[in-house]
């Protein structure tokens, strides 16, 4: 018992923390927000199309492909819900594509659970150890 106490005391005396605190951080006075190429870029330059077509980020955002609330030119008849489903016509899956699992061939369908499997799920498998049998 005393040996364990002495061993623990020795471990705590030698232990040094892994975290080194470097002190309070300082905020730079000037922050450059101009577009920069990624440091791992092979060409070390931005694409020419980016610089020529987008003067600011807000201009880029206006021209970016958006399908949500960022797009400013949303029309009521565009996108999902713009026209009734009847106007879309019949929806048929292509050859080899199935919408429902029950449309698949028999070998790919879900197998029904046996009573033993249902019992194992409901009891957490405890009855299998009690009965001495496994699935």
From Swiss-Prot:
* Any one of the GO BP annotations: 2-oxoglutarate metabolic process
Question: Which GO molecular function terms does the record list?
Answer: oxoglutarate dehydrogenase (succinyl-transferring) activity
Main location, first listed in the record? mitochondrion
Provide the alphabetized UniProt keywords.
Mitochondrion
In which compartments does the protein localize? Answer: Mitochondrion
Pfam families assigned to the protein according to its UniProt record, in alphabetical order: Kgd4-YMR31
**PANTHER family, per database record:** 28S RIBOSOMAL PROTEIN S36, MITOCHONDRIAL (PTHR31601), ALPHA-KETOGLUTARATE DEHYDROGENASE COMPONENT 4 (PTHR31601:SF2)
Its annotated function is as follows: Molecular adapter that is necessary to a form a stable 2-oxoglutarate dehydrogenase enzyme complex (OGDC). Required for incorporation of the E3 subunit into the E1-E2 core of mitochondrial OGDC, and acting as a stability factor for the fully assembled complex.
Q: How does it assemble?
A: Component of the 2-oxoglutarate dehydrogenase complex (OGDC), also called alpha-ketoglutarate dehydrogenase (KGDH) complex. The copmplex is composed of the catalytic subunits OGDH (2-oxoglutarate dehydrogenase; also called E1 subunit), DLST (dihydrolipoamide succinyltransferase; also called E2 subunit) and DLD (dihydrolipoamide dehydrogenase; also called E3 subunit), and the assembly factor KGD4. Within OGDC, interacts (via N-terminus) with E3 subunit and (via C-terminus) with the complex core formed by E1 and E2 subunits.
Q: Which family does it belong to?
A: Belongs to the alpha-ketoglutarate dehydrogenase component 4 family.
Q: What is the designated name of this protein?
A: Alpha-ketoglutarate dehydrogenase subunit 4, mitochondrial
Originating organism: Chaetomium thermophilum (strain DSM 1495 / CBS 144.50 / IMI 039719)
């Amino acid at each position: 018992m005393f040996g364990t106490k002495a061993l623990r005391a020795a471990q705590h005396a030698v232990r040094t923390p892994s975290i080194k605190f470097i002190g309070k951080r300082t905020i730079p006075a000037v922050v450059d927000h101009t577009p920069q190429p990624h440091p791992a870029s092979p060409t070390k330059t931005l694409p020419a199309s980016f610089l020529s077509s987008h003067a600011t980020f807000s201009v880029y955002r206006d021209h970016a492909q958006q399908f949500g609330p960022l797009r400013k030119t949303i029309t009521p008849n565009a996108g999902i819900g713009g026209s009734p489903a009847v106007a879309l016509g019949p929806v048929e899956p292509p050859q080899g594509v199935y919408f429902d699992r029950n449309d698949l061939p028999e070998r790919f369908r879900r197998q029904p659970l046996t009573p033993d499997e249902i019992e194992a799920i409901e009891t957490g498998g405890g009855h299998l150890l009690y009965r001495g049998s496994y699935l």
